[in-house]
């Protein structure tokens, strides 16, 4: 089975668009309590949005591709920070490099543009053939990216943008998310669970374009469904949350005693959020589908009750190398690739991650076969 999936099927897009439109038509005035009929309509629409993303995305085949011309080429994978999700993608990229014959070098920043820019300049100086930027917005290090273009380096933008966003200057390809529909589904999950009476706090890094966009999409969908439901957005310090977030959560739940939900969009933050919520009944939503978080959901040892799961993190590393390899030789169809995702909760978390992504059981072989190796 294939690992490359098209998440944004036309019927699915039409469904979500029609649901969101219906939500807007049925809104009460902001600040007013919902009537019985309005609440029923809200819950019905919320369930439709939620369920639209619960199912496993459709599979499409990876096009055959001759990897041999890329043997010995150098690709640098630069992550914004050394957090578990990025590390697992990097591990996958290293494994794909060994399988493909591409020399993959991993570099982590500290969450700042300075370290990311320094890494890009180092890669350029050392003659890299390709550079993949994970959670590093190319526009924030534009001078360094411009230098890569002059040097003929293939640069890919990884999980910084959503479907259809324009490609930044100096970038050859991007690995994007279907973030608008994902956030509509997550807002639907909260409203279906709360019967459209939610009080939600969201932590999202404003410094990352994809999470900044996600917070806007979630806010819009949430308020379309329930304009009178309380919602607060707080900036997450992506480079320092391991030291600061637990105390921040403790402060926030004292400040907001009626809080029902926390949506911490960076999956790596879950242990910190859980620690801050010890003994509390606040429900947590997150993103990224990290294996530890999904397993904790199964064992009921976390406050997380819904997670937007990517395909296995290591497989995204293989996708990064695959995209780079195709772009390095000018192959078609690799300029924008959508990262597969699925809304996971108790209805579909199953006994193991293999049950969430059955098509990924042997994804490594799928790649090597498509590469002719």
Where in the sequence are the language-model features?
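Extracytoplasmic "Venus flytrap"
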Residues: 29-92, 96, 100, 105-117, ...
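Hinge/cleft segment of the Venus flytrap/periplasmic-binding protein
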Residues: 24, 29-73, 312-373
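An alpha-beta-alpha
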Residues: 74-75, 79, 93, 182-226, ...
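Short beta-strand elements in bilobed, periplasmic/extracellular small-molecule ligand-binding domains
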Residues: 98-110, 172-173, 199-202, 219-243
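C-terminal motif of bacterial Sec signal peptides marking the signal peptidase cleavage site
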Residues: 18-22
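Flexible loop/hinge segments that line or gate small-molecule binding clefts
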Residues: 139, 143-181, 291-303
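Hydrophobic alpha-helical
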Residues: 133-150, 218, 238-296
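Hydrophobic alpha-helical segments within soluble ligand-binding/sensing domains
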Residues: 116, 173-199, 212-213, 245-246, ...
């Amino acid at each position: 089975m294939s690992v490359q999936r098209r998440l944004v099927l036309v019927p699915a897009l039409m469904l979500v668009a029609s649901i969101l439109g219906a939500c807007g038509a049925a809104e009460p005035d902001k600040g007013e309590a919902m009537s019985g009929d309005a609440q029923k309509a809200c819950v019905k629409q919320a369930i439709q949005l939620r369920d639209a993303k619960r199912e496993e995305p459709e599979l499409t085949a990876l096009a055959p591709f001759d990897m041999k011309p890329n043997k010995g080429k150098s690709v640098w994978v630069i992550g914004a920070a050394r957090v578990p999700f990025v590390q697992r993608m990097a591990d996958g990229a290293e494994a794909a490099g060994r399988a493909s014959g591409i020399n993959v070098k991993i570099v982590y920043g500290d969450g700042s543009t300075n370290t990311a820019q320094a890494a890009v300049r180092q890669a350029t100086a050392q003659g890299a053939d390709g550079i993949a930027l994970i959670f590093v917005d190319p526009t924030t290090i534009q001078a360094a990216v411009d230098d890569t273009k002059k040097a003929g380096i293939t640069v890919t933008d990884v999980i910084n943008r959503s479907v259809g966003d324009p490609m930044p200057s100096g970038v050859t390809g991007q690995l994007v998310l279907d973030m608008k529909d994902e956030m509509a589904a997550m807002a639907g999950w909260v409203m279906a669970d709360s019967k459209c009476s939610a009080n939600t706090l969201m932590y999202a890094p404003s410094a990352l374009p994809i999470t900044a966009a996600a917070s806007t999409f979630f806010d819009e969908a949430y308020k379309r469904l329930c304009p009178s439901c309380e919602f607060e957005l707080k900036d997450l310090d992506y480079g320092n949350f391991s030291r600061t977030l637990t105390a921040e959560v403790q402060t926030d739940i004292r400040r907001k005693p009626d809080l029902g939900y926390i949506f911490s969009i960076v999956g790596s933050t879950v242990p910190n959020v859980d620690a801050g919520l010890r003994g509390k009944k606040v429900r947590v939503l997150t993103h990224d589908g990290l294996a530890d978080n999904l397993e904790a959901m199964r064992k009921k040892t976390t406050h997380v009750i819904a997670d937007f799961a990517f395909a296995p993190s290591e497989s995204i590393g293989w996708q990064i190398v695959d995209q780079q390899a195709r772009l390095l030789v000018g192959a078609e169809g690799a300029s924008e690739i959508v990262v597969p995702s699925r809304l996971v909760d108790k209805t579909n978390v199953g006994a193991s991650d293999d049950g969430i992504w059955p098509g990924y059981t042997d994804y490594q072989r799928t790649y090597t076969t498509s590469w002719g190796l």
